[in-house]
Amino acid sequence: IEETGWFVWNMATYDLREAVNRSAKALPYGEDEFEFAGVTKASCLEAPGARVAESPINFEIEFVQSLHIPTGNPVSTFDLIIGRVAHVHIKDEFILDDGKIDILSIKPLARLGYYDYTYVDKMFEMKAPAATAEELAGLEGRTD
């Protein structure tokens, strides 16, 4: 990431859970992670490399900086990588008529810890208290 100045984030979903799990395996240098995970490569607009074609949402992210955080363990490290999203790819079938993302159809996957995962299958709206119309529009990602 630091060498190329780019990285790609692919949304993990319930439907991709097996590929996500396979992608956690450390592979020998040069072995194709996409092939090993059983997913298809899609080209990026600027980032070198590829994104996961089966993922409903992908971000091409320009590298900003890395923070190397000590873990207290001489064998392992924790690196926090910070970037700026340069390009967002969203499959059309997951964009609702109002322009929002159909999260319930995507079923985003989240790791809870241990061997446990969950996915989004319920959603509710909760507006910020005492927010102005302009602030609420900003929270929705609008600029009007």
Predicted segment positions?
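Basic, polyanion-binding surface patches
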Residues: 2-144
